[in-house]
Design a protein with these regions (language model features):
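Alpha-helical recognition/docking segments in bacterial nutrient-uptake
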Residues: 1-2, 60-163
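N-terminal helix-turn-helix DNA-binding module of bacterial transcription factors
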Residues: 1-61
Length: 163
């Protein structure tokens, strides 16, 4: 099985340093347009695919937002999720969508799983019911969180709320 091309392969193909390729991948303005085009062409020519997981390990920011909705079968929440996802994309974020189906236990499990996958933040429309498990996971994650439409009563003042 052939190995995936690396940043070093791109640098060699483009005739630049590994640091220059890294700057291009980060979108740095300090790279000349001609060099940027050369690096992008080299990436295409050798089939280089940016490894976002590796970048996440280096930067500690995944660019992923966990959007946890209480009931995606409700057309209101479906529309909200679609619109919010598009707005997040405009800001450079990818969205991971989770439906808690009004189950607080499932909600806390989903949030925990999203934390394990390294989301950079949460937007949650909390499920009704027991809040302790969800709050415990959110508190331990220390991840920016915005509550929408509903708020966790015991989280008042801890996580911003937007209705």
């Amino acid at each position: 099985m052939k190995q995936r091309p690396t940043i070093l392969d791109v640098a060699k193909q483009a005739g630049v340093s590994k640091s220059t390729v890294s700057l291009v991948l980060q979108g740095s303005a300090s790279v000349k347009d001609e060099t940027r085009k050369s690096v992008r062409k080299a990436m295409t020519d050798i089939g280089y695919v940016y490894n976002r997981s590796a970048a996440t390990l280096r930067s500690a920011s995944s660019g992923l937002i966990g959007l946890v909705i209480n009931d995606l079968r409700n057309p209101f929440f479906t529309e909200f999720a679609a619109l919010f996802q598009m707005e997040l994309a405009k800001a450079g974020f990818a969205t991971v969508l989770a439906n808690s189906d009004e189950d607080p236990k499932l909600q806390s499990q989903m949030i925990s799983s999203l934390v394990e996958h390294g989301v950079s933040g949460f937007i949650i429309s909390p499920s009704y019911g027991e809040e302790a498990a969800t709050l415990s996971v959110l508190d331990a994650a220390n991840t920016p969180t915005l509550q929408v439409f509903r708020s966790l009563e015991r989280a008042e003042g801890t996580y911003p709320f937007l209705a």
